[in-house]
Amino acid sequence: MIINHNMSAINAQRVQGBVTGVTKNMV
């Protein structure tokens, strides 16, 4: 469970980072 939770957190952070990168490129 802990490993799965960490994986989910990493995936969420990765997606958030991708969105932030796209936003910066648009700006």
From Swiss-Prot:
One of its GO terms (cellular component) is periplasmic flagellum. It comes from the Bacteria. Its main location: periplasm. The flagellum consists of an outer layer composed of repeating units of FlaA around a core that contains one or all of five antigenically related polypeptides. Keywords: Bacterial flagellum, Periplasm. Component of the core of the flagella. This is Flagellar filament 34 kDa core protein. The keyword RNA-binding does not apply. It comes from Spirochaeta aurantia. Belongs to the bacterial flagellin family. It is found in: Periplasmic flagellum; Periplasm.
